[in-house]
């Protein structure tokens, strides 16, 4: 009879211990870091084209 309360407490602790996301990742899931990198790259491109001088096209698009 001493084991019954311990068993009940263990059963109550098991569901609260699963803090891991149980859904598997799909191909459509994109990490936030790559999303932010894409946003920075997109914002950097117009800034770089504005810095180009009209006489020197070699600096454009870098």
UniProtKB/Swiss-Prot annotation:
One of its GO terms (cellular component) is extracellular region. Residues 1-19 form the signal peptide. Contains 2 disulfide bonds that can be either 'C1-C3, C2-C4' or 'C1-C4, C2-C3', since these disulfide connectivities have been observed for conotoxins with cysteine framework V (for examples, see AC P0DQQ7 and AC P81755). Its main location: secreted. It holds the Pfam family Chi-conotoxin. It comes from the Eukaryota. This is Conotoxin Mi5.2. It comes from Conus miles (Soldier cone).
């Amino acid at each position: 009879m001493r084991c019954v309360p311990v068993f009940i407490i263990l059963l109550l602790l098991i569901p609260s211990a699963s803090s891991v996301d149980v859904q598997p990742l799909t191909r459509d899931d994109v990490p936030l870091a790559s999303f932010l990198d894409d946003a920075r790259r997109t914002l950097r491109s117009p800034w770089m084209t504005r810095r180009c001088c009209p006489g020197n096209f070699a600096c454009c698009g870098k």
